[in-house]
Amino acid sequence: DGKIVDVFEMPKMAVGKKNKSQVNASQIFNEIQKAIEGEDKTKVIAVIEQVSAMPGQGVTSMFNFGQSFGVLKGIFSAMQIPMDFVSPVKWKKFFNLINTNKDASRTKAIEIYPYFSSKLSKKKDANKADAILISSFYYQNAKY
């Protein structure tokens, strides 16, 4: 029915001594499991932003980014949750967010889903707002 059941920050954990981090796959699994508890599993779908390399991004940064993407795909595959992918240009164009600042997506998400406003109260919550809008775009445009 297009219901967005939850949104949370990507769990991370420290790696090594250089203040680096990586996604915490176990915690991602736990968060997803908790979010879909009691839901009809046949109606659950993971919508992931299909991103690619960005100009000026270093090799290590791109490797870590790709690794995180792969972790998500692996978790959803293991949980037998179907996935679909949405390009940034498509969802941003749909919500009229092309060439806007990062905070514009937070404002748009709060306007559409005011019940998530407490989870989007800080500027650093723009990534969660993006996730909400990606899900909303998918629901409004997907051909089931």
Model-derived segments and their meaning:
Residues D1-Y144:
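Phosphate- and other anionic-substrate recognition elements at nucleic-acid/protein interfaces
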